[in-house]
Design a protein with these regions (language model features):
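Catalytic beta-strand/loop cores that center a nucleophilic Ser/Cys/Thr
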Residues: 109-154
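Short beta-strand segments
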Residues: 4, 121-122, 161
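N-terminal beta1-alpha1 cap of cysteine-dependent amidohydrolase-like domains
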Residues: 1-65, 74-76, 170-171, 177-182
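Generic structural signal for residues in well-ordered beta-strands
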Residues: 25-28, 89, 139
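Histidine-centered divalent metal-coordination motifs
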Residues: 75, 124, 163
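C-terminal and late-domain segments of enzyme folds
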Residues: 136-151, 156-182
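Short loop/helix-cap segments at secondary-structure boundaries that form the rim of catalytic
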Residues: 20, 35-40, 81-84, 130-134, ...
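Cysteine-nucleophile active-site neighborhood
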Residues: 41-109, 119, 176
């Protein structure tokens, strides 16, 4: 069972659709629903959202409890994972509905298996400050100099600043299936 932590963002339904197409059982719970802290799931996806991690319900408590397990943070979820481990966020010129090409990709990571199109959709106005990223978080890809993907070393915990569930990320479904298959 995949738990989707909904940060009050409509893109959560795009994530759910990809999971459904992949044949994965899932449930969706809001970020302020205390049941997200109870466990009872195999893995979790933290959805995008309109805020910052500290202002998003129980999100940081959730990351504290379940990081190191099989966890995928998308946009706000990515920022929460990075911030929990010590990185700082900074406001950037908004990239809402922008498509970028991933660069500096760590092709050794299984997240990219079978992916040949590295265009990604971006919808964010905050970014992780690269110089504050702790060594435990390995950068897997950049775009326009911004961190787009990280992995917590030795775990199945990932953060994606871009939106794999967006139509602007043609290979996003493959990326999510690769994560599910870990």
């Amino acid at each position: 069972m995949v738990l989707i932590v909904d940060n009050y963002d409509s893109f959560v339904f795009n994530v759910a659709q990809i999971l459904e197409e992949a044949g994965a059982a899932y449930c969706v719970r809001k970020n302020d629903d205390h049941s997200i802290l109870d466990g009872g799931f195999d893995c979790a996806i933290i959805s995008p959202g309109p805020s910052v991690p500290d202002e998003s319900g129980l999100l940081m408590r959730f990351v504290e409890k379940f990081s190191g397990g099989k966890l995928l943070g998308i946009c706000l979820g990515h920022q929460a994972i990075c911030e929990f481990f010590g990185a700082k966020l900074r406001r950037i010129t908004p990239a809402h509905g922008a498509q970028s090409e991933l660069t500096d990709i760590d092709f050794s990571d299984p997240l990219w298996r079978g992916v040949s199109d590295f265009r990604v959709g971006r919808y964010h106005s905050w970014s992780v400050e690269r110089q504050t990223l702790p060594p435990r978080l390995r950068v897997l890809a950049l775009a326009d100099g911004e961190i787009m993907a990280v992995r917590l070393s030795g775990t199945k915990t990932y953060g994606l600043q871009f939106h794999p569930e967006s139509f602007l990320t043609p290979a996003g479904g493959q990326m999510l299936r690769n994560w599910l298959d870990l």
